[in-house]
Design a protein with these regions (language model features):
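Bacterial Sec-dependent N-terminal signal peptides
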Residues: 1-22
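Disulfide-rich extracellular domains of secreted proteins
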Residues: 20-375
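Boundary/activation segment at the start of structured domains
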Residues: 28, 393-394
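Aromatic/hydrophobic beta-strand junction motif of beta-rich domains
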Residues: 259-263, 384, 397
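Local beta-strand/beta-hairpin segments that build beta-sheet-rich folds
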Residues: 288, 397-398, 435
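Extended, compositionally biased intrinsically disordered regions at domain boundaries
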Residues: 376-380
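Extracytoplasmic
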Residues: 381-391, 401-469
Length: 469
């Protein structure tokens, strides 16, 4: 029997040292029979004689130029006159797919001003204006038309003295309401109008987007998935370590560990960035590496799964000039690094030369120990941070956008003898229908089993609501 632990990390953006930080908090947490996957693409590319930004840039030689040596311009592949920038990435299920449980969209860029130029050895602004970057356009395979998306600001360096030359920003939007009811999830996703600095700026301009998708998979084992986001600069003076807990590796047999992530400003020919794993139970540390990603040049402008470059994108540049997206298995032969019964895992992000910003990281654990598997069985548990409702464990019997569907489910539960109530979450723009709120998880589980036995509701589940200031 094999087990799987997956750690997801989205990281990004060139920056000066000792930058301002945004504390990392849980964005999403769930127990689910399913998987997590990330897709994305860069949104600016080089423009040079004989090549437009829409043409893939494939130079991965030791002499390949860095993004601060190019005239960087917007990619725009959608043939839509209403967009100034757009790129696509393809999503497909790993194994048998199912309903999307969560989808989160991130976009980020270096953006001190609209455009700049290199004169001699000095970067000069050409257009000092800086447009609003909080909204983008988003197209899914199901809708095939752009939907405007407004984001939640995670970080903006425009007013930070240490960061203003690059002025990186990061935005996030929960797009679950667009993917969860979709009849077509597999296909190309397009993000348009991500703002970034054009031309040449200090350190080079980079920009991209990433879509995190958590989906149900009936053939999967129960997994715990947690995502965190925030902002922290990684420099030669400032490293970052995340201690993941709340899991326990199997008591016996082999299991696998995997990480995924996204970065900005990981230049191909600038060495010194490294990601390593430390396991307290074994006392061992190992650096991550693959044929695509050397241990001491981990962020190198590529999009990969293990040893293979991913090309299901438009454009499908082999050198993405400062944008990285990766998925890698962790070598753990004979449980040398991560032993059985391990309960914590540290991810270490370091840099010896250049700098980047970390803004999201996540953990997925598949095939939990017997006691956890038995406890949660097929019951989905989703954690939500909210200030507008009482914290506790809510037994959910339906989630809908349409008020007619809400009323129908409430009436349906009434016919079964339950007084269903509705909690409207403004952040997700969703109506959660629940039949009880409990202080203890065990009491909520009992109610779930009762609903299963006494109604025809297909999948009651638990919403774990926490209140954070």
């Amino acid at each position: 029997m094999k087990y799987l632990i997956t750690v997801l990390a989205l990281i990004g953006l060139l920056a000066p040292t000792q930058a301002q930080t945004t504390d990392f908090k849980i964005r999403y947490e769930t127990f689910i029979k399913g998987d997590i996957k990330i897709i994305g693409n860069n949104v600016i590319n080089r423009k040079e004689k004989g090549a437009s930004p829409n043409d893939p840039y494939n130079d991965r030689s030791p002499k390949a130029k860095l993004n601060d040596e190019f005239d960087m311009q917007y990619i725009d592949v959608d043939n839509d006159p209403n967009t100034f920038a757009s790129s696509t990435a393809h999503f497909s299920y790993d194994g048998t797919g199912g309903k999307v449980a969560y989808a989160g969209l991130y976009w980020a860029a270096t953006y001190p001003y609209n455009s700049g130029v290199l004169r001699g050895t000095k970067n000069i602004p050409v257009d000092k204006n800086r447009e609003e970057a909080s909204s983008v356009l988003f197209k899914t395979p199901d809708i095939n038309a752009y939907v405007p998306i407004s984001g939640e600001l995670i970080y903006d360096g425009i007013n930070d003295e240490k960061l203003k030359n690059a002025a990186p920003y990061v935005y996030y939007a929960n797009v679950t309401s667009l993917l969860a009811p979709a009849t077509k999830v597999v296909g190309d996703y397009t993000v348009a109008n991500v703002r970034a600095a054009l031309g040449q700026i200090e350190g080079g301009s980079a920009a991209g987007w990433a879509l995190v998708i958590v989906y149900e998979n009936p053939d999967s084992n129960v997994k715990k998935i947690i995502t965190y986001d925030g902002f922290s600069a990684i420099t030669n003076e400032e490293s970052k370590t995340f201690s993941f807990k709340g899991f326990k590796t199997p008591e016996e047999d082999d299991f696998k560990t995997r990480i995924m992530g996204v970065t900005l400003e990981g230049d191909l020919n600038m060495m010194g960035d490294n990601v390593s794993i430390t396991v307290p139970e074994s006392g061992k540390t190992t650096s991550l590496e693959s044929k695509v990603r050397p241990a001491q040049n981990f962020f190198n402008s590529s999009i990969n799964v293990n040893d293979d470059l991913v090309t299901q994108r438009k454009p499908a540049s082999l050198n993405t000039l400062g944008f990285d997206l990766f998925r890698m298995d962790i070598k753990n032969d004979n449980r040398y690094l991560i032993p059985n019964n391990a309960t914590s895992l540290d991810l270490n992000y370091t840099r010896s030369r250049d700098r980047y910003f970390l803004f999201l990281t996540a953990l997925e654990i598949e095939n939990n120990p017997k006691e956890i598997t038995q406890l949660y069985r097929s019951t989905r548990v989703t954690k939500l941070t909210a200030k507008d409702t009482e914290k506790g464990y809510y037994v959910i019997v339906g989630v809908f956008l349409n008020i007619n569907n809400v009323n129908k489910r409430v009436e349906e539960m009434k016919n079964f003898g339950y007084d269903a109530r509705v909690y409207y979450n403004r952040d997700q723009v969703l109506n959660f229908i629940y039949v009880g709120r409990f202080d203890k998880y065990e009491d909520a589980m009992k109610k779930v089993e009762e609903i299963r036995e006494n109604t025809e509701i297909p999948d009651p589940w638990i919403l774990d609501v926490a209140n954070y200031e």
